[in-house]
Amino acid sequence: MDEAIAYMELQDMQHKYLHQLSGGQTQRAYIAMVIAQNTEYILLDEPLNNLDMKHSVQIMKILRKLVTDLNKTIVIVIHDINFASFYSDYIVALKDGAIESEGRTEHIIQSNVLRGIYDMDIEIEEINDNRVCVYYA
């Protein structure tokens, strides 16, 4: 458990109750509980829900580190295509409850594929070797 607490950077608050933690701290505590179980697979449903940008990025970086450092397989349900683009190796895109498209991130984050998933035009820009989906225009 100490390793999981350290991994999630929760040492300063490890003796607090969950209801005393902020939203981001609570999410990290839940993920620490999963890490402590030391399973090969981690399944997370909307781990960024109700988090600000700072904490969302922090969680995604930690999850990516779990894959790299501890060889974990992580499956995440997430609605932000740019988080999926930056942090995923493989994407399964659902539309109306069925798989619309799946494949390595570089194959999914393409305008023609995303048009089929979202029924809208999405421009793709490259920033620091990462594909960013621009769909606000």
Which residues does each PLM region occupy?
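Conserved ABC ATPase "signature" region
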Residues: 1-13
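Conserved ABC ATPase signature
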Residues: 17-21, 25
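Catalytic Walker B motif of ABC-type/P-loop ATPase nucleotide-binding domains
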Residues: 42-46
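Helical segment within the ABC ATPase nucleotide-binding domain
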Residues: 57-69
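ABC ATPase "signature
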Residues: 102-103
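ABC ATPase nucleotide-binding domains
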Residues: 115-137
